[in-house]
Amino acid sequence: MADTQKLVLFSGSSARFGYDSAALDAALPHYEVVNMGVFAYTNALPQLELIRAQMRPGDLLLLSPEFDAAKRQFFTTNAFDDAFFCMAEADYDIVARLDLQQYSGVFSALGSYLQTRADMTARSYAVSPSDLDEDGNAVDTPSYNEYGDYVLYRPDAVDDTPIYGLPVDYTTASFPYDTYIAPANAEFDRFAADGVRVYLTYSPRNSRAVSADSTPEAVAALDAYFRENLDVVFLTPLQDSLMPGRYFYGTDNHLSTNGVTMRTAQVIDALTKQLQVEGIAP
């Protein structure tokens, strides 16, 4: 798809659990939709560099960084980790497409990955991720569609109670400029220099799975801080990403099936309006 005009969705697993890409595809007929959300707790930098090599002028990149893994999602380090090699198992040659001189810890991460892999029971490469659910259990219908969305039905939660005791901080103090904003802008600017339009919509999170300091005023201030400093076009307010916990399944940032429908409709509305403002056909 390198030569096809496309919309690439990028985040961690909240993206593969967070979009109805078929609905996006229908709303944006000029673009092929690709969901590249995999795992937030590995460095996003090498992932995005591999993605950037496949994008062309006029393509759209829609980011939705996960704040519970902010250091990795905002490129605060160039270090490799073993999880990156897990994602490369289908084609180890993709590692050679990166300029490894730009990264640290490559061989230590590889060693850690190989050690872990050696202790695991071998599985057939004929088995696709779509043959298994998120917990590794075999399923009768594909768990992923052709876009990369996780599509097994996920019911709403019975109430809004957070799943994990991990209250994420949505305050400006948690995102100092030099640590988070500067490296993020450096990567975003590489895409822009290639003619790729870069947009941001915040990743969804259970509104009760935030810190006590993350008051509505603090959330609004953080949104304003990002808008003032990040070199991207913002589609939606930060507050809109904090949703009732009933619309999540299994974690505080994986949406239920109903949550996906709601969130995708919000993104479609915001993105199509922004493209119209820019004079671009959806």
Positions of PLM-derived features:
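Residue-level recognition of beta-strand->loop/alpha-helix junctions
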Residues: 35-37, 202, 236-238
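Second-shell loop/turn segments in exported
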Residues: 9-10, 35-38, 170-177, 187, ...
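C-terminal regions of proteins
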Residues: 213-282
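Membrane-embedded segments
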Residues: 10, 14-97
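N-terminal secretory targeting modules
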Residues: 1-6, 282
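Secreted/periplasmic serine-hydrolase-like ester/acetyl group-modifying domain
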Residues: 80-194
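Active-site segments of SGNH/GDSL-like serine hydrolases
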Residues: 188-214
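Loop/turn elements at helix/coil->beta-strand transitions in domains of secreted/extracellular proteins
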Residues: 4-6, 29-32, 56-60, 192-199, ...
